[in-house]
Amino acid sequence: MKNVTVKSLAVEMQISVDHLVQQFSNVGFHKTARDYVTQQEKETLLAYLKYELSNTPLTLQRKTRSTLNIASTSGRSKSVQVEVRKKHIYIQPVAHDSILTIKENILPNNTQEVKNNAEASPKTKFILTPKQQSKIAKNNIVNNQNNLIKKSRQISEKAILEAKAAELKHQAEEETRRKVEEKARQIAEEARQFAEHNDSIWMTTPELAEDDTIDDNLSNYHYASIVEDENNRKIENERRTRGNKVSKQKTYRLSEFKKNREEARAVGRSSKSQSKRKSSTLMQVFNKPSQVINRDIVIGEMITVAELANKMAVKGSQIIKKLIQLGVMATINQIIDRETAQLVAEDMGHKVILLRENELEESIMKDRKIDSSVDNAESRAPVVTIMGHVDHGKTSLLDYIRSTKVVASEAGGITQHIGAYHVETDRGMITFLDTPGHAAFTAMRARGARTTDIVVLVVAADNGAMPQTIEAIQHAKAAKVPIVVAVNKIDKKEANPENIKNELTKHGIIPEEWGGQNQFVNISAKYGTGINNLLDAILLQAEVLELKAIRNGIASGIVIESFLDKGRGPVATILVREGTLHHGDMILCGLEYGRVRAMRDEQGRHLSTAGPSVPVEILGLSGVPIAGDEAMVVRDEKKAREVALYRQGKFREGKLARKHSAKLENMFTNISEGGILELNIILKTDVQGSVEAINDALEQLSTEKAKVKIIGSGVGGITETDATLAAASNAILIGFNVRADASARRIIDKENLNIHYYSVIYHLINEVTQAMNGMLTPEYKQDIIGLAEVRNVFSVPKFGLIAGCMVIEGIVKRHNNIRVIRNNIIIYEGELYSLRRFKDDVNEVRNGMECGIGVKNYTDIRTGDIIEVFKLIPIIKSSN
C-alpha cells in the first residue's frame, strides 16, 4: 500500500496535524507534517490509541426529578420541581502489588500479548518492536504511580483543611457566646444599679414599682435581643462569605435567653414594645419608586381606562382626573379612543407606541392585488342612479325602461325588487340604481351617488325643483358625478320645461344649449315619450367619461342593499366594480364573510359569473351586511373569518364608546334628564337601507320633553324574540313592509302589545309624533264662567249646609269646580254638587238670579263669601 504523509493522515482521521504529531511522539516516532507514514507505523499508532481509550474512566451521570409541595404564607401550597444529579466515575482499581506484575509481564513478554490482541481484533493488525513495547509499559507504570501519589496528597490536604475550618468555627462560636454573655451581664448590672438608686421612689407606689420592674425587664431583654440579632447577622454573613453551611443546631444563640424573653413579653405586652419589635423577614414590603418611571405604552384603536392605567402602572383615578382636565367624563370601564389615550399618556410623561391592528386587513389586500394597468382594462357599462324628489316619477321611469327592454317571456319574471337593474340597448348595457326621494333616505342617496357614474335627475315639469331635488344635486356635486336632467310629466298641461331650466340654473345646473355641461331631456314616463333620447344621452355621457374596468381577476364591489330572508338567510345585492365574481368564491363583506352559494340577477336567473357593472343578488354570507360596505373576494377563508371578527369587535367597541361618551359641558344636562319621557320602539324593516333611514328620522323627532329610543332594529319579519323584548321593555312594535309570524302574534295577543304596520314612511313618522304628544302630561286652562255672592247660609237635613247666593257675574253650572273666596283669599277649592232655584234642581243659573249652592265636603261658608265657578279646558300639547 502506498505511504501517506502525516498531513493527509490527519485529514483522513479528522484531527489536527499537531495533535497527530503529538500522538506519534507519544508512541516513539518523531514526525513532521511532511514526513511519510508507513503501514507498520499506522498500525502501531492505532494500537496505542486503542490502549489509551481502554484506560479512559467511565463516567455515569444520573438525573432524578421529583416534586415538592411547600406551604406558603398565604396558606396555599406551592409545587417546586427538584432535580438531583449524581455523577459516578468507574476506574479499574490498580493495586501496588499489581504494578510489579504488570512490569514483569510487559517488559519480557509484551510481544506475545500484542500479537494476541492483534489476532483478537482482525480489523487492526500491527506489530510492536520490543523497544517500543517496553517504552509504552514504562510510561503507563509511571503514570499510574503519579496518579496514586496525587490522590493521596489531595485526601490528606482536604482532611487538614476540614480540621482547620472546624477549629476556626468553634473559636468563632465561643467568642460570640462570650461577648453576648458579657454584654448581658453589663446591661443587668446597669439595671440593678439604677433600681437601687431609685428604690425610695418606687417603694412609695408598690403597684407602679411592680409594673416598672416588668418594663425594666422588658427593656433589658429588648437590648439583649438586639445584640443577639446583630451577632446572628454577623454569623450569617460569615457563613455566606465562606460558602459553608451553618449547623442546624443553634445552641450558640442563647436559646434559654430567648425563652425567658418570650415569657416576659407574654406577661407584659405593651404597644411600645410591639412597635419596637422587628418585623418578620417573610413580610413583603413595597418600596415606592424614588423617581418617575417612563414607560413605552402600546395603544391600539380602542382602550379602556382600566387597561390604560395598568399599562402606565398608575391608579385608574389618576387617569380619570386627567381626562376630566381634558374635558372628557369617563368611568374606569369606559372605552376611549386612541387620540385621547395618547394625549393622557404623553401628558403623564410616557412614550406612546401606536399599534397597527389592521395588519391582517392589509395583508389580505396585498394578497388580492390584481394587475390594474390600463392595458388590461376594458370598457364597462355605466352605472346610472335615478334621483329626484318624491312622486316626481323616478320609479315610473325605471319601470317603463325595464318593461320595454326586458323580454317579457323570460321564466320567473321579476322575483324581488332589489333596487338595481341592468338593461340591454342597441348601443350597449346600462345599469340603473333607484334611490328613494324622501328626506329620511339621505344616506341611501349619498351611497348611490358614491357608487354611480352618471346621475339622472328627474324633475316634474309641473312641480319644479323641490328640497330633495336640491339635495340630490348636492350629493352629485360632492361625488363629482355628471348630471343628466330628465324633465318628466311633459304630457301635462301645466308642464313648463323652460321654467325648470331657470330654477336649476340657480343651483349650478346649466343646459348645454345655454353654454353649460348638463343635458336636458324632456320625457314622459307614463307614455314613454323621449325615453330613447334619454338612453342615448346616458350612453353619450358614458363615452365621454371613458369608463374602464379590469374584467379578469379577483372581484370587488359594493353592497347596494341587504335583507334577511326567512327561507334563504342573509341576502345581499352587490354591484361588481372590477374583476369577475364566480359562484363559490370566498367573499369578505364588511363585518360579514361567507362563500357565494347562489348568485342571480334582478330577474331571478341563476348566474355562474358576474362582470363589472352587473348587480347580483348573492346568498351564503354569515349575516346581513350594512348597505354601503365594500365587498371583496379573498383567497383564504381563515383570514376572512379573522378579519370579519376583528371588524365586528372594532365596530362594537366604537358603538359602545359613542354610546357612553359624555363631555364635561353636558354633565348637568345628563344629570337633569331624569324627567324626560321616553318612547321605546322596536323597528323591523324589509331592507337594510330602510332601517338606517327610519332610525335617523325617528331620532330627529326627539325633543327636550320626549325622546324616541330605538330599543332594537333589524331586517326581517317580527319574531317571537322581538315580541318578548317589547313586552319586557314596554316598547311599541313597528313593522315597515314586514309582518309578525304566528309565534310573535301569540305573544302580542297575550301581552296586549302595541304593534303598527306601515308601508309609507310619512304615516309612520306622523303616528310616532302623535304617540309622543300623547305621552306628555296633560295641561289644563282654568276658565272662570261665573261668580256668586253668599247672601245667607242655612242648613238642610238632606244636603247639609246650603249657601243662598246671588249670581253677580256670568253663569253657574252644576258639577263644575268652584273656589270659596273670603276677603280676596282663596280658602277652599272643590266641586259644586248641588244647585237649586227655589225647590227645583237646575243645571245652571244665569246672572242676576238667586240660587242655592251646596259645596261638597265643606261646611265653613259664611255670609259675604264669593263663590267662583270655573271649568278646566285641556291644552293640546306638542312634543316640540
Swiss-Prot record:
InterPro entries for this protein: DNA-bd_dom_put_sf, EF-G-like_DII, EFTu-like_2, IF2_assoc_dom_bac, IF2_II, IF2_N, P-loop_NTPase, Small_GTP-bd
Database matches in PROSITE patterns: G_TR_2, IF2
Region annotation G1: where it falls in the sequence: 388-395
Source organism superkingdom: Bacteria
Keyword Ligase on entry: no
Keywords: Cytoplasm, GTP-binding, Initiation factor, Nucleotide-binding, Protein biosynthesis
Compartments, record wording: Cytoplasm
Matches recorded under PANTHER family: TR-TYPE G DOMAIN-CONTAINING PROTEIN, TRANSLATION INITIATION FACTOR IF-2-RELATED
Task performed by this protein: One of the essential components for the initiation of protein synthesis. Protects formylmethionyl-tRNA from spontaneous hydrolysis and promotes its binding to the 30S ribosomal subunits. Also involved in the hydrolysis of GTP during the formation of the 70S ribosomal complex.
Protein name (Swiss-Prot/TrEMBL): Translation initiation factor IF-2
Gene: infB
